[in-house]
Amino acid sequence: MVMVNFTAGKWISEPKVSEVTSEFVSITTEPKTDFWQRSYYGFRNENAPALLIDSKDNFTFTAKVSFAYQQLFDQCGLIIYLDNENWFKASIEYENQSFSRLGSVVTNLGYSDWATTDIPLPKEIWYRLSRRGPDFLIESSFDGLVFNQMRIFHLHQLGETTIEMAKCNPPLPTQKVVSFGVYACSSSESSFTAKFTEMSLEPCKWLAH
């Protein structure tokens, strides 16, 4: 396991206020920023800030996220970004003082799919993202020790999944590069600061079924 240094990362929609060191990333959101494509609402939003690194390998990426949300739909978490019509994000989205939505959005071929569960709003959470070729596992934890599955998903642009791939430990090598990292945004008239720490990268821990 190695700690991830995002100082050489690449920005999508670099924010006006951010800090990137060898130990943490801090993003202050701007109002009316988001990632979403078409489904239900019809609109296409792709102006949220995200800081990315590239890998062609199978991996497990873990990060702690700390935040103090202000308004509806404030969110921050992990992201995979292939292009504006093929990407993934995981986060807690602020709903109201009673609950928020822990969930993930998978966007394939220009349409977003949002899956959530309602939870009391914490001030921090850990996410763990694992890659096996074109398939991914996203998990979350409230203590950084015990992780629970949120979702298994596929990104179509990375190709098909075969029975042979599903049986291999470690996963079969992949040569297709993915960009992944952290993001934060405020879909409404809001702003908050998200801080990402304890960011690590290691060989894929997601075993074959």
What are these regions (language model features)?
Residues 1-209:
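Extracellular glycan-recognition regions
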